[in-house]
Amino acid sequence: MYKKMSLRQLFSDRPPLNAVLQEKAQKLRYACSPSKCIHSLLSFLPIITWLPKYDWSHSFFGDLSGGLTMAVFSVPQGIALASITGVPPVYGLYTAIFPSFLYIFFGTSKHNALGGFAVLSLMTHGAIEKVMLRTATSYNATAYVNHTLDELLDKENETALISNTTLMQILGNETSFVEEVTMEMWTEGVTPVKQIHVATTIIFLAGVIQVFMGVFRLQYLTSLFSEQVMSGFVVGGGIHVFFAQIGNMLGIELPRRSGPGYLYYRIWDLVENLDNVHIPTVCISLSSFLFLVFGKEYLAPWLNSAFNYPVPFELVLVVVGITATNYAELSLRHDVKVVGNIPTEFPPPSLPRFDLIRHIGLNAAAIAITAVAIHITVAKVVEKRYKYKINHGQELYALGFVGVLSSFFPVFPVTSGFARSVVGAAVGGSTQLTCLFSSLALLSVILCIGPALEYLPQCILSAMIIFAQKGMLEKFGELKSLWPVFKIDFTIWLMSFFLTVCYDMGEGLLMAIGFAVLTTIIRTQRPKWHFLSRDDDTENYKETKKRDLERIQGNVCIFRMDAPLIFTSSDRFTMSVWQCVKKWERCKSESFVTIEQMNSDRSADIFDSKLKSARRRWKRDQKSENRCKLVIDCDGFPYVDYLGLSTLKSVYVDLQAAGIQCFFVVQKSDLKKLFRATDFYEVVDESKVFNKVGDAVKAAEQHISSPKTTKEILTALASIATTDTVLIDEESSDSNDNDDAEIQERITEESENSEEVMSETSVSIEDATSLTSSRNSINSEE
């Protein structure tokens, strides 16, 4: 494919190897200098750049107000997200403190605030359940390794190691089984794996993955998370969150479920336990939900405009719930479940459980990529709203460093949330110091008023979580705008939603991305092509609709396909070229006056059909001289691969064999180098490759041959028409109506490509008739 001489010519303008090596060594020496290394390390800490320029007089009080407001909203939200993750409530507050504080040093966004996210918490919960069950099963199996299966399951033996009850717990109720094994491990002096251990290991591994994404500049991978994929995924995640919290709202204790399709089992467990609904819990949940609906939907717009300050209805609900539960003793008298003990001390740092990495690798990768996609999406919205630039590459490092450093404290995976990011800005927050004040306020909440949160009912948290999913469910409105115009995007949205709901969060997201990529591949296999024509006003060549082809002067067809010419689209390109030629010639033929329009006498229809058939046959014999000239504009190809280049050569050869002169327009330097480095010019005449479309059109017009004389055309038509007269007369005696229809269809098809001849030579019906009559008389005399 590549020729030795062509490669030499291609790289002949490059400097000698020694000069290149010396230049590289000099650049490496400069990059490894102490000053450059220090500058590179400091580039990972944007705070060094913006903090000395901080405007204390104009920004301090706004950031302080924004931080306190953010802390007020983060208290109930953090506790609620901890319940989704399946860890103690205080860890939700820790998650709102440490990542947000660390992001100040590494982030480039002034408004992004890191914290828990419902979808990530649910994905983390699934990984925790998987690891806890695996660990419990593995430990439990070691106690029975020396026993046979019959001994373990002996129904008649009262000392059987595994009873039917225990077996049912393993198969149907993971909750009791995991808890019993955990208690047994504590009894025997073995430190069991806690849920927070799994969560911290996940955020550590996810942070490492995000750092590597930053090193290799893989932020472009977030482009795979199209808006439709993320919308369907987030809405599907909202469905998972709803069924994860509905049990707490109803006061039903449901068994743990995890793995693909666990949502079906969760729904079945919910239906089976409807008889166990706790009425006091339902009343508290319903009243809490109605309070949020009334306050957030009806009172909030009026109060926000009146006080110019967002009212924290969630915090008001938490205070009311704690007060009512404490003084009415709801947990003691009516068995209403509450949050429980919250430590009032600063957690000591500890290492993650590295031995769990082999169990959570895939989960951590899915969580890492999802967190990056959500964070970059929020960053883009913030960029657009507040009109400043965010370094997306540095944001990958920021997420990674925050994850790795936060894993030394009891936290779970985090990302940005749009509501959390703008709530501080709504009251004046304008820099990253907003997160600093928020973290300090949350820390004071834990150390000072943490014990008061012990009386918060869990059903109130569940009501807050389910109400928060309302915004996600509003994304169903996107389908209405997608369906009329963007049907493929509509399908991607629905597939992402159904895969997330029906399968699982992590696996469903990966399959949704795969489906979106598949639709992209299919669309590259069916690229759009169009004709080009000259604009008389600008003298440039523009896209022309197929119905406007008859307005184009001349017989030079300009073809352009706007898509990569690669292995997925090469067959489509070949088909499109021939389709272009066919439509061009048919349109040019139909644009001239037909014989039916020249002679409307119905008595001459049979002769007209014979004459059109004769013209069609003559045109077919002469087509190698009068077919259109094709110009292929290669600037529509972003890039061309090996098969695409072979397709170009094959199309050129086939067009030449069919009598169609083919010309190419190439302006891109990369494509020119590709042509010269390969054997392209051994197949294609280099004189037929041009830099501009206008030059190619002029060259094509010079190749058009002069038409036949009128006498030659009429003589040929009359000769062929005489033969057709005899053949059609013989066939008509034995044909039925269907045969006549077939002949008429064939005649019509032939006339479509032959009427150009009559227009070019101004042939009339009378001339052809007289010539044919004289020809018949000569034949009769013979």
Curated annotation (Swiss-Prot):
Family listed: Belongs to the SLC26A/SulP transporter (TC 2.A.53) family.
Organism superkingdom: Eukaryota
Main location: membrane
Region (Disordered): 728-782
Sections of the chain in a coiled coil: none
Composition bias, Acidic residues: 728-742
NCBIfam families xref list: sulP (TIGR00815)
An annotated GO BP: chloride transmembrane transport
Chaperone listed as a keyword: no
Keyword Membrane: yes
Domain STAS: start-end pairs: 546-700
Localisation: Membrane
InterPro entries referenced in this protein's UniProt entry, alphabetically: S04_transporter_CS, SLC26A/SulP_dom, SLC26A/SulP_fam, STAS_dom, STAS_dom_sf
Ranges annotated as spanning the membrane: 30-52, 64-84, 86-106, 113-133, 196-216, 232-252, 274-294, 302-322, 359-379, 398-418, 433-453, 497-517
Topology class, membrane: Multi-pass membrane protein
Protein name per Swiss-Prot or TrEMBL: Sulfate permease family protein 3
Gene Ontology CC entries for this record: plasma membrane
Function of the protein: Possible sulfate transporter.
GO molecular function, one term: secondary active sulfate transmembrane transporter activity
